[in-house]
């Protein structure tokens, strides 16, 4: 959620920055609402002052033996009018807040301007894609040959875009998550968290999934015994970031760095016909998430650090990748700046996204009222939040199967994973 000063006092600047990401801000409507708000605010305050002043005169009139009935009637009328104005003002503020909740974050000035993913900017590559002297198989063929990817059973049990993993491939999937968690906690300084896979509406509002992305969620019915509606998490970013909702932290507590391995659930609304084969786009998938809570002046450095942490996973696994900075037109709703890391997939002969790391600045913190108390002035100020995939486990499995495949259909286990696989050097 943007600072309301941008929607009140800096409308032209805000409109220009949002236009760069393809969002049209109706500033005429906002100006009209703001004028109405000011008018109602003044009217409410004047009515309150008049009512208070006249109420005080009742006692004086009584002491003089005067009939106070007319004054009482006047106070009653003012009270009725005041209540009506308060209701009108509350409804207007709710309308303004709803608009504010639907406005995306302002892109950082360092973000390249562009209309869509074709204008994202590659900033570096690592590793050389392997040259094969045999026909390359995709992960679906490899997984089915190895007896480890069972799409038919998943369709029977649940439906499309789900998977049953078995044997060595299931073990590698588990090993990858453990490897990533160990790397982030031991080498990168994160604290591991185990979090709920179900979250309430306040949590989804806090991180920006609601109200805009309600169609992407799997919602549970009926509500809980507390009467709360719950949804399956689309990413661990939601429960982990909400750990600091409605909290005032000490400056000494920052930065907070948390990692969590969870299943994630997405309806993939709008993705009909995309990546229908294999593990690339599933309704349920595992991901190791990284979240940082930092002071505002440190958030851009923290973003670069987080990208490096995600890249380090791929380096240790020996998987070629490239890193791109997203242009204004391709960024997510809450992001001020985003880097995507794309891993090389030989069967597709291209790079595919395996991690997205974003600096959200104070966009989520304002929604969540996540603050810290500065040592300098002891006043609460909004933190900055960052999130990133470290990595998507299923897509990492896909990359290993395809990049480490052999001519006989076996798959070499990357050296970094072997301690997590009981020393196994090869699948198949």
Swiss-Prot record:
Catalytic activity: tRNA(Ser) + L-serine + ATP = L-seryl-tRNA(Ser) + AMP + diphosphate + H(+); tRNA(Sec) + L-serine + ATP = L-seryl-tRNA(Sec) + AMP + diphosphate + H(+)
InterPro entries: aa-tRNA-synt_IIb (IPR002314), aa-tRNA-synth_II (IPR006195), aa-tRNA-synth_II/BPL/LPL (IPR045864), Ser-tRNA-ligase_type_1 (IPR002317), Ser-tRNA-synth_1_N (IPR015866), SerRS_1_N_sf (IPR042103), SerRS_core (IPR033729), tRNA-bd_arm (IPR010978)
Pathway annotation: Aminoacyl-tRNA biosynthesis; selenocysteinyl-tRNA(Sec) biosynthesis; L-seryl-tRNA(Sec) from L-serine and tRNA(Sec): step 1/1
Keyword Protease set for record: no
Subcellular location: Cytoplasm
Keywords: Aminoacyl-tRNA synthetase, ATP-binding, Cytoplasm, Ligase, Nucleotide-binding, Protein biosynthesis
GO function term, MF aspect, one: ATP binding
Residues annotated for L-serine binding in this entry: 235-237, 289, 389
PROSITE patterns: AA_TRNA_LIGASE_II
GO annotation (BP), single: selenocysteine biosynthetic process
Pfam families reported in the protein's UniProt record: Seryl_tRNA_N, tRNA-synt_2b
Disulfide bonding pattern of the chain: none
Residues where ATP binds: 266-268, 353-356
EC number(s) recorded for this UniProt protein: 6.1.1.11
Primary subcellular site in the record, as a coarse category: cytoplasm
Gene Ontology cellular-component annotations: cytoplasm
Domain of life (superkingdom): Bacteria
Record's subunit section: Homodimer. The tRNA molecule binds across the dimer.
Function: Catalyzes the attachment of serine to tRNA(Ser). Is also able to aminoacylate tRNA(Sec) with serine, to form the misacylated tRNA L-seryl-tRNA(Sec), which will be further converted into selenocysteinyl-tRNA(Sec).
Domain free text: Consists of two distinct domains, a catalytic core and a N-terminal extension that is involved in tRNA binding.
Family affiliation: Belongs to the class-II aminoacyl-tRNA synthetase family. Type-1 seryl-tRNA synthetase subfamily.
Designated name of the protein: Serine--tRNA ligase
Organism: Shewanella amazonensis (strain ATCC BAA-1098 / SB2B)
Chain's gene name: serS
């Amino acid at each position: 959620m943007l600072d309301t000063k941008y929607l009140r006092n800096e409308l032209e600047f805000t409109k220009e920055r949002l236009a760069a990401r393809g969002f049209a801000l109706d500033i005429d409507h906002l100006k009209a609402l703001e004028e109405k708000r000011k008018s109602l605010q003044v009217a409410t305050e004047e009515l309150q002052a008049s009512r208070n002043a006249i109420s005080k005169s009742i006692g004086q009139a009584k002491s003089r033996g005067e009939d106070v009935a007319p004054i009482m009637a006047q106070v009653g009328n003012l009270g009725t009018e005041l209540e009506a104005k308060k209701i009108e003002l509350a409804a207007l503020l709710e309308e303004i807040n709803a608009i504010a909740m639907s406005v995306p974050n302002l892109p950082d000035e360092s973000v390249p301007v562009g209309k869509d993913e074709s204008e994202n900017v590659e900033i570096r590559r690592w590793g050389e894609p392997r040259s094969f002297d045999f026909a390359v198989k995709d992960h679906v063929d490899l997984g089915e040959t190895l007896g480890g990817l069972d799409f038919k059973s998943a369709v029977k049990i649940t439906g499309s875009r789900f998977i049953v993993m078995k044997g060595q491939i299931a073990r590698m999937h588990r090993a990858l998550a453990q490897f990533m968690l160990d790397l982030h906690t031991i080498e990168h300084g994160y604290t591991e968290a185990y979090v709920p896979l179900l979250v309430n509406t306040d949590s989804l509002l806090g991180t920006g999934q609601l109200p805009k992305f309600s169609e992407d969620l799997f919602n549970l019915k009926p509500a809980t015994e507390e009467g709360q509606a719950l949804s399956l998490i689309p990413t661990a970013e939601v429960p982990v970031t909400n750990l600091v909702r409605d909290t005032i932290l000490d400056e000494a507590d920052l930065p907070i760095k948390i990692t969590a391995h969870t299943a994630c659930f997405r309806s993939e609304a709008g993705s009909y016909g995309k990546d229908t084969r294999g593990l690339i786009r599933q309704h349920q998938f595992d991901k190791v998430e990284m979240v940082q809570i930092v002071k505002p002046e440190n958030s851009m450095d923290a973003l670069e650090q987080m990208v490096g942490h995600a890249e380090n996973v791929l380096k240790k696994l020996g998987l070629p990748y490239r890193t791109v900075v997203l242009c204004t037109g391709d960024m997510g709703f809450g992001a001020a700046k985003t880097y995507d890391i794309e891993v090389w997939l030989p069967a597709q002969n291209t790079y595919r996204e395996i991690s997205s790391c974003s600096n959200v600045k104070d966009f989520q913190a304002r929604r969540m009222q996540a603050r810290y108390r500065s040592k300098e002035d002891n006043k609460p100020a909004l933190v900055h939040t960052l999130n990133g995939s470290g990595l998507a486990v299923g897509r990492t499995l896909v990359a290993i199967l395809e990049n480490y495949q052999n001519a006989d259909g076996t798959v070499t286990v990357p050296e970094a994973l072997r301690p997590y696989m009981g020393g196994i050097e090869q699948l198949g």
